[in-house]
């Protein structure tokens, strides 16, 4: 189990945390195998497979998000060294709920990295970059800091917009092999 806090929250005082199964293989077990054990024991593997495939990309997407957050400290994002990344969720300055997949602070504390993670066949990076910039205007912790944007995606559609770093599975795996 792991306790996940939104970026910038104090470990000792926050009540805004979620508890998750840390190991992706155990998450797979409790999401797909355990609920279908009786069907699998009856040999109905094909039926279980069909049912599981409807949500499997969502499961892989959550693991991909974890990998993206782990990779931020090792990837060359705007030649800045980053602290470990976190998710962030909560009300923006406009009191509307916001969620970001990747938020990291630079080692010197002057820069903030904002990122989106998608596990889809075609991701339009320009649209995601635009959404990130829009969300950045409502984040309570970005005042006085230099913002950087990044997208982690399974497959990229279109070109890479200026001012946005883009990473795929090969980039993430290479960075995590260190």
Q: Residue locations for each model-derived region?
A:
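Short hydrophobic beta-strand motif reused across regulatory alpha/beta modules
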Residues: 1-2
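A cross-kingdom feature that marks ATP-driven nucleic-acid transaction machinery
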Residues: 5-178
């Amino acid at each position: 189990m792991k306790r996940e806090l939104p970026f910038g929250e104090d470990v000792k005082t926050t009540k805004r945390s979620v508890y998750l199964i840390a190991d992706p293989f155990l998450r797979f077990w409790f999401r797909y195998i355990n609920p279908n054990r009786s069907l699998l024991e009856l040999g109905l593997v094909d039926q279980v497979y069909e049912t599981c495939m409807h949500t499997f990309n969502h499961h892989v997407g959550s693991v991909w998000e974890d990998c993206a957050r782990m990779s931020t400290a090792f990837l060359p994002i705007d030649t800045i060294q980053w602290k470990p990344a976190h998710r962030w969720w909560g009300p923006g300055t406009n009191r509307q709920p916001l969620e970001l997949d990747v938020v990291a602070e630079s080692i010197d504390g002057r820069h903030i990295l904002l990122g989106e993670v998608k596990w889809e066949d075609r991701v339009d990076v320009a649209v995601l970059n635009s959404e990130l910039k829009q969300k950045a205007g409502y984040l309570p912790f970005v005042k006085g800091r230099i913002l950087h944007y990044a997208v982690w995606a399974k497959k990229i559609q279109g070109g890479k917009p200026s001012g946005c770093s883009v990473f795929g599975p090969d980039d993430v795996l290479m960075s995590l092999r260190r």
